[in-house]
Amino acid sequence: MRYNFSVKKVGIMKISVGVSNRHCHLTKEVYEKLFGKSELTFKRALNQLGQFASEETVIIKGPKGSIEKVRVLGPFRSYNQVEVSKTDAYKLGINPPVRKSGHLDGASELEIIGPKDKITLPCGIIANRHIHISDALAKEWGVVDDEPVGVIIDGEKK
């Protein structure tokens, strides 16, 4: 899909928009605990340079329910984070904050269950809406990291 968005310094630009389902980012240490091995198994590349979906999945469990087959994304991070939707949060019985990735203050506690072990961590968030673009494109368009941009999506719900 391609959508238009307006950058005040440039005008109308076209970008591809992707939707990210629930997923998790893990540290190498937590991954080794959950899976009993040290390396992620590459499944497919993501749109973000250097990022990938792994073959590995976990179960996430909250006070009221659980969700299976939550994809682990790579590479390893310096923090553990589970990104869910508002609907997922309701099913799990949690009230996670809307946050930028990596900002875990107030994150909901979730149990992450792998094939070898499990761990409970304050790691559940709803990811704030954001756009991934290359440094070169950001420079060309005159935007910097974390700068708000206006996005207009054509369609019935415009």
Regions found by a protein language model. Name each.
Residues M13:
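Catalytic domains of riboflavin
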Residues R2-K9:
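Short, positively charged and aromatic/hydrophobic N-terminal segments
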Residues S16-P63, E68-P115, T120-I152, K158:
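Short beta-strand-centered segments at strand-helix junctions
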Residues K9-V10, E29:
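Intrinsic disorder/low-complexity segments enriched in polar/small residues
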